[in-house]
Amino acid sequence: MDKRQICIKFAREVSAILKIAAPAIRFVPVKQLRTSTQIVALTPDGILIRNDIGVTPELFFAIAHELRHAYQLENDRSLHDYRTSDQLDIDEYNAQPLEVDANAFAAVVMAEFFGISPQFLNMPESIRQLICVRKRQIQKEL
């Protein structure tokens, strides 16, 4: 399987867990994403994936994270107070409930699919704890 097929298959499997329709997947140049460090983005037209990134755990984590955002949108999670990464500093951004939830869900997926447990070492302990608590809640729900 090539990268496109692998990503589509993974997105379908994760979407089935979330009980959402698998969004379209497009590979795009990095300039079409919000930042140069972004790997994957959820748009109204589907998921955009950087075309210059290889098949890595980070790619799968990012796809699962964005699919959780798609789930949040479909299930009317409040976006009223949500701010994008260019509107807040990185710690404030990651502490938002929707980001905590998406990170926790992606961590559960990584553990279930690949036996990998993301540590979030680039985040403060307070945010890691929020993710850990939410991760345990999600594990009970699945």
Q: Model segments located where?
A:
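Long, well-structured alpha-helical subdomains associated
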Residues: 92-95, 106-142
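Short, exposed beta-strand/loop patches in secreted or surface proteins that constitute
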Residues: 37-42
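Substrate-binding/catalytic groove segments of enzymes
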Residues: 71-82, 111-120
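Short pre-active-site segment immediately N-terminal to the catalytic Zn-binding motif
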Residues: 47-63
